[in-house]
Curated annotation (Swiss-Prot):
The keyword ATP-binding applies. This is UPF0200 protein SSO1041. Transmembrane segments: none annotated. Keywords: ATP-binding, Nucleotide-binding. It comes from the Archaea. Signal peptide: none annotated. Pfam families: AAA_18 (PF13238). Belongs to the UPF0200 family. GO terms for molecular function: ATP binding.
Length: 188
């Protein structure tokens, strides 16, 4: 079943926590893309269905166990509804099962863009930002990385059509993002 007749381009953003995925998504939104943050879609369900004391990541794992590994992708496509955007972005792809589900539902104009940043830079960013799901302890950040890798995020990064390295200043990162976006929109 396809939800859209795809004359649009779809970008699936992946990357480890703190790599710059959300910043890339913001830049795409500024260019007119429809952006759906996958963790926000999970959080919406979490607020209704989570067990007392259950962590968001554990809730997402439980959803996958019950409904299959592509469930978050399906929920995100449902969230998309009918879109009149030329570019649709899903921020936070974590497994190849999700990639396959997006391709099954949205067609072949789906491109994986990985945002990569070295661990020391990512950890520094996460300690400095004020997100509720970020720990301030390096050991917890390393544990979170391992959990993400167990979900299959490393395989998605390895299969990326494009990789943006985020190891410099914001202006350089923005330039790299624009370059990749232009390539996707022009050539696919």
């Amino acid at each position: 079943m396809s939800y859209l007749v795809v004359t649009i381009k779809v970008i699936l953003i992946t990357g480890m926590p703190g790599s710059g995925k959300s910043e890339f998504a913001k830049l795409l939104k500024e260019r007119g893309a429809k952006v759906i943050v996958m963790s926000d879609v999970v959080r919406k369900r979490y607020s209704i269905e989570a067990k007392p004391g259950e962590r968001l990541m554990d809730f997402a794992k439980r959803l996958r166990e019950i409904y299959g590994d592509g469930v978050v992708a399906r929920l995100c496509v449902e969230e998309l509804g009918t879109s009149n955007h030329d570019l649709v972005v899903f921020d936070g792809v974590r497994s190849l099962a999700e990639v396959e589900e997006f391709k099954r539902l949205l067609g072949d104009s789906v491109y994986i863009v990985a945002v990569h940043s070295p661990p020391k830079i990512r950890y520094k960013r996460m300690i400095e930002r004020l997100r509720s799901d970020d720990s301030k302890e390096i050991s917890e950040l390393i544990r979170r990385d391992r959990e993400e890798l167990k979900l299959g995020i490393g395989e998605v990064i390895a299969m990326a059509d494009y990789i943006i390295t985020n190891d410099s200043n914001y202006e350089e990162f923005k330039r790299r993002c624009e370059e990749v976006t232009d390539r996707v929109l022009k050539n696919g």
